[in-house]
């Protein structure tokens, strides 16, 4: 993403992971600050937040069912032992964390973002229109004076990046020198610049700030005019001057004065501009592509009233400082939702997420979006992320938004730019995986992005120019190695919790900046608490399902403990929520019963015929009373196991939903048994049985008018899962073929035709499930996709990887 984005409303918002150069915070009760100057929040790593007693308890009926549905939150003994007498319970910690995040999401404005000393200095340079010789915005100079760091520099206090510290510091020195104030601070800052300028050569080029090669040399020229001499003959500076000359020769002057481009973001570094023409390219808010420094430069040259209004509003909003870009409303809305989804805690915030996506959809255009609303310039990063989230949540969005970014067989991050950003192409890849049938531009995007990312990974070049994050190679690697069709929610969350850097992730613009509503430790700590709580419940369920396995001697019918574990893992990694325990266990037990019957009787046609006959007899007589059945001992044992399990599931559903689903369960099983009897093929009808069982256990029903769509979903799901099951059976004793990063297959392989058909059918299924215009409950449709993705995972994931995922998801606590 070229820049970034956020949201709007005018209530003061609670602050999270904040800094001295952030908009002054209104802290949450319970957040402790290290000093009055440094506003960074200190988080207690053992819990989320303790709400101060002065804050009234908040009722949250909208998510109470998520926290309590007769299934208690699990508190490990070791956690209990460490708790202090006044420490709140795990349930309350989660509830308080949820309340805090709800408060954040409910108070989003135009973007919570850190202050940029560089941009603040540019605004400080503006001369008062009515009183020449004095600053137009004196509070910016006060901010500069108050925020010099102990090492005499200005910039991000928690990450030392030479580019960032130098450009911030030199800009502040120039501002102080221009108005002849704070000479000691100015001298100290100048010494820092001279001592550190040679370090530029040692930093990763990918982490060079946006437009640094234009902006920094321009600052050096301004410094010379003020009598500030800075040696610029070091090799690093010579390289920067070379890049500047090259970039300036590539700038299409005729275009930039007539058509909105990203160059509007960096006008302060460009010489010989026609301001009369450029003023016509202002954004609606008076800014030049939402850049305070660019707009300040424009104000100096034009005295434009709209530029003044934009800057004046920012200076007042942020108490003297200004960010490097503003607003960032779309960026904040989109990325906050993405983080909550990937951290596995989105279920707590469904209304807030819906509100965020409604906001994004309101400002969506046929050409995509950028980081802020009402922009005439778009970027592929925000467009890709917005497209993906909107489509996932049932909004109708056209892939034609990507046409303007297509350049031959490649895609560019911003129209007119040739260099690529890893995260921009990564998010394009993620978006392209949600393609519907006949969306050729997404097919091309997926192929290009997959190849691009794979080459970068091979070359160990997964550094990004837009963000410095904890584990970008891990994020990209997971996307390449686990196709979205095979991505199980709990696997993604377990790994992403380790990849997400919380408040330590830093964004790269003209300066380093922070987005505390996107990257913060509150999300992270809540995700950890919730994950471990869910995992504790899963461990209890695993113990109970092993008892069920032993009670009915499932092992005696040929199903191993290993098979039991894998089956329970797949169900749990797909449906993990504590409140969905009955659905999860029904899935696991149903799948085990199917595998038991299929493996034990599959090789004997006689027994395959006998079992359905006995099943019919038992169903007709009714097994409620546990009557002993005629027939062979094995058949009798299996029949008893099936009906005892079905009756137990029915009782669970009756308790949870007040509905007797016994006849429907029997009917679904009868259909599967007859299908199996006729063919006995791998996976034949199993997906339908699982989907029907899960939806019944969840209390989901569909109307008569939706029957045709329901049957179409069943047919497509059965077809795909049957093909996947057949493929898995053929390849279970050899290494599964890895789906290529471009989403395709090697067509020289004789099995490729069927795999391509699977991909085609998957696209159709995804379209049916994500299409909201048909009126069917999305939860019902989502079950079809969830089950199908589990089959895809099983078919195409290497056994060693499955073992790793099982260990991580079920048995390794998050710390």
Swiss-Prot record:
Activity regulation statement: Inhibited by high concentrations of magnesium.
Subcellular location, record wording: Plastid, Chloroplast
Cofactor: Mg(2+)
Reactions listed under catalytic activity: (2E,6E,10E)-geranylgeranyl diphosphate = (-)-kolavenyl diphosphate
Magnesium among keywords: yes
Record-level GO BP terms: diterpenoid biosynthetic process; gibberellin biosynthetic process
Positions bound to substrate: 247, 465
A Pfam family it matches: Terpene_synth
Motif mapping: DXDD motif: 379-382
E.C. number: 5.5.1.28
Coiled coil: none
Transit peptide: 1-50
GO terms of molecular function: isomerase activity; magnesium ion binding; terpene synthase activity
Keywords assigned by UniProt, alphabetized: Chloroplast, Isomerase, Magnesium, Metal-binding, Plastid, Transit peptide
Cell division listed as a keyword: no
Gene Ontology CC: one annotated term: chloroplast
Annotated residues for binding of Mg(2+): 379, 381
Main location: plastid
Function of the protein: Diterpene synthase that catalyzes the formation of (-)-kolavenyl diphosphate from geranylgeranyl diphosphate (GGPP).
Domains as described in the record: The Asp-Xaa-Asp-Asp (DXDD) motif is important for the catalytic activity through binding to Mg(2+).
Membership in a protein family: Belongs to the terpene synthase family. Tpsc subfamily.
Name of the protein in its database record: (-)-kolavenyl diphosphate synthase TPS10, chloroplastic
Organism this protein belongs to: Tripterygium wilfordii
Upper taxonomic lineage: Eukaryota, Viridiplantae, Streptophyta, Embryophyta, Tracheophyta
Gene, per the UniProt record: TPS10
